């Protein structure tokens, strides 16, 4: 598979990036996040945050990447 094709597939998989606030910490690295739009989503921690032991607590501001397929689920990619 060429670089161009891989890049196109990676761009297609990217979700919508929004900011929000962690409302509740759930088991297994899951969090309930209230987005700036007012919507509440269920989000899990991205692998890089988990590997680097970035702590996320209720009340933290975070960037969430929403899945284009299911807008009620997302991935926390950055803690602000």
Curated annotation (Swiss-Prot):
What the entry lists under CDD domains is as follows: S1_IF1
PROSITE patterns given in the database record: S1_IF1_TYPE (PS50832)
Which Gene3D superfamilies does its entry note?
Nucleic acid-binding proteins
Under the cellular component aspect of Gene Ontology, which terms does the record hold? Answer: cytosol
Domain S1-like per the UniProt entry, residue ranges: 6-80
Domain of life assignment: Bacteria
User: Where is it mostly found?
Assistant: cytoplasm
Keyword ATP-binding annotated:
no
InterPro entries from the entry?
NA-bd_OB-fold, RNA-binding_domain_S1_IF1, S1_domain, TIF_IF1
Record's keyword annotation contains Cell inner membrane: no
Places the protein is found: Cytoplasm
The protein's matches in SMART domains, at most eight in alphabetical order, are given as:
S1
| UniProt-listed Pfam families | eIF-1a (PF01176)
Q: Which UniProt keywords apply?
A: Cytoplasm, Initiation factor, Protein biosynthesis, RNA-binding, rRNA-binding
The entry lists its GO molecular-function terms as: ribosome binding; rRNA binding; translation initiation factor activity
Described function: One of the essential components for the initiation of protein synthesis. Stabilizes the binding of IF-2 and IF-3 on the 30S subunit to which N-formylmethionyl-tRNA(fMet) subsequently binds. Helps modulate mRNA selection, yielding the 30S pre-initiation complex (PIC). Upon addition of the 50S ribosomal subunit IF-1, IF-2 and IF-3 are released leaving the mature 70S translation initiation complex.
PANTHER family, from UniProt? Answer: TRANSLATION INITIATION FACTOR IF-1, CHLOROPLASTIC (PTHR33370:SF1)
Description of how the protein assembles with itself and partners: Component of the 30S ribosomal translation pre-initiation complex which assembles on the 30S ribosome in the order IF-2 and IF-3, IF-1 and N-formylmethionyl-tRNA(fMet); mRNA recruitment can occur at any time during PIC assembly.
The similarity annotation says: Belongs to the IF-1 family.
Q: What is the protein's name according to its record?
A: Translation initiation factor IF-1
Q: What is the organism of origin for this protein?
A: Aquifex aeolicus (strain VF5)
Ranked from the top, the taxonomy reads:
Bacteria, Pseudomonadati, Aquificota, Aquificia, Aquificales
């Amino acid at each position: 598979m060429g670089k161009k094709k891989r890049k196109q597939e990676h761009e297609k998989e990217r979700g919508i990036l929004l900011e929000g606030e962690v409302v509740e910490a759930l088991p297994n690295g899951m969090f309930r996040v209230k987005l700036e739009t007012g919507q509440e989503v269920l989000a899990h921690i991205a692998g890089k945050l988990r590997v680097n032991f970035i702590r996320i607590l209720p009340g933290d501001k975070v960037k969430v990447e929403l899945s284009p397929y299911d807008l009620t689920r997302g991935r926390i990619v950055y803690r602000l």
